[in-house]
Each structure stands twice: as C-alpha cells, then as structure tokens.
Design a protein with these regions (language model features):
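PP2C/PPM-type serine/threonine phosphatase catalytic domain
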Residues: 1-254
Length: 254
C-alpha cells in the first residue's frame, strides 16, 4: 500500500504573521500540523521548534537503533504511538525551556497533530485543538477530540447547538506544547485500509468550514489532485473570512 500526500499553509486575511507550520517527511511516513501561539514571534518559534524536533527524532531513531530516547517508551502503546508521543514530549520540553530562558518568548506554545504510518498501521497523536479527520466510504469522521475548554464543558453539561456556537471561550485550549514542563499526548492506532484519506488541520480551517460535510465535498471534488484539494480548502476558508492562519495536510492510502 502506498501513500499520496500534500500540504499547504496560508496566513489568512486577518493575521500579520503565519504561526502555523506543517511537516511532510516521506522517509518516515511522518506528517505533522502545528498551530503556534503567544507573543510577537513566539508562536512562530514554537511551531517551528515542534516540527523540527519531531522530524529530527524520527530521523535519529531511523538511522541509529541504539540511540537513547529522551523518554521511556510506554509498554501499552505501539512503536508508532511511542515514537509520536516521545517526539512531541521532547519538543514540548525544548519549547518550555526556551520560553523560560528568553523573555520575549515567554508564554509561547503550539498545538500538534501528527500521523505516522508503517507496514500495517497508522498512528495518530495530538495535543491541543488541531484535528485529524478520516474520509472512508464517502463519510468523514473526526478522530481527535479537541483539548479545549469547550470540550471540557461538554463533558459535564448537555450543551445545545446554539450554546456551542455562542460559547465565549471556544478557542481556549487546555493543553499545548510549551505550557508545562511535561505534556499529556493522546494517541490512537488504526489498521491501514486502501482508499482511506486523512486530513490534518488547524482551527483556521474548521473554524471557517464548520460543517465537516463541506470539507468532505471539497476534498471529493478535487481528490484526483491532493495539492489542488489542499489549495481549495484554504481558498474556501479564506472566502469565509480567513480570520486565522490556515494549514492542511492530506494523506491518502492507495
């Protein structure tokens, strides 16, 4: 089974900087989207550090089997889940300490959502409110749950659609890289299935295209060319307002 993939990012229509970053590392079947936050330049620094640290960890573990991991693997997780988790934790540690050392970077952080693929499985890891969707059999499914204040409220209260739409703190996240010296990473593993397509994206996309069916229809319309699909998703989010940076990565199994 092979992979097709594409990624794109855009500053949007309201922001002065693009604090998003994405990574496509075909040698390791590694795909990442990060949405940075904090300070004048902090968000850009944090998201760039995250993709760099994750990329380097996968490179080092690919080329050196004897390398000492910065965190002990969790026996309950698959090797792919462990590699994603440790790479994110390592990035978090570096971001946290850099923010503590440099005053102008205090408070910086980033989300991260990532996919890694091996011979039989596809693993997903995430921190924050950047998402992973899967398109299978003509249906789109959100596989990740946002680490946000809204999701915390939904655990304990039955909110109506109107209450969710008008929730005042919808964009407040409860986890990010750089927030604390350690970070809890959510992971999951799925068997590979021919025809599956995975979308990694930040809130700049789904905040404008709020109906997942619109995301599905856009991808299906341009599915023969994933670069065009990624470009069109961003264009439609910009036409809806482009209030934030917009980043997407598409990964299809065929």
């Amino acid at each position: 089974m092979k992979l097709r993939f594409a990624g794109a990012t855009d500053i949007g229509r309201k922001r002065k900087q693009n604090q998003d970053r994405f990574l496509i590392q075909p040698e390791d079947n590694l795909f990442v989207v990060c949405d940075g936050m904090g300070g004048h330049l902090g968000g850009e620094v944090a998201s760039q550090m995250a993709v760099d640290d994750m990329a380097n960890f996968f490179i080092q573990t690919r080329t050196d089997d004897e390398i000492t991991w910065p965190y002990r693997p969790d026996k309950r997780l698959s090797i792919l889940e462990n590699k994603l988790t440790v790479s994110i934790k390592w990035a978090n540690w570096n971001i946290f300490h850099k923010a503590a050392e440099e005053v102008e970077l205090n408070g910086m952080g980033t989300t991260s959502v990532a996919i890694a693929v091996d011979e039989k499985h596809l693993a997903i890891a995430h921190v924050g409110d950047s998402r992973c969707y899967r398109i299978r059999g003509g249906e789109i499914t959100q596989l990740t749950t946002d680490h946000s204040l809204l999701e915390e409220y939904k655990k304990y209260s039955a909110l109506s659609e109107e209450e969710i739409a008008n929730f005042a703190y919808k964009n407040v996240i409860t986890r990010s890289l750089g927030m604390k010296v350690t970070v809890l990473v959510d992971t999951q593993t799925h068997p590979k299935k021919t025809g599956d397509l995975y979308l990694l994206c930040c809130d700049g996309l789904y905040g404008e295209l709020e109906d997942p069916q619109e995301i599905l229809h856009t991808i299906n319309e341009f599915r023969s060319n994933l670069d065009e699909a990624a470009t069109e998703l961003i264009a439609r989010a910009n036409r809806r307002g482009g209030r934030d940076n917009i980043t997407v990565v598409l990964v299809e199994l065929y």
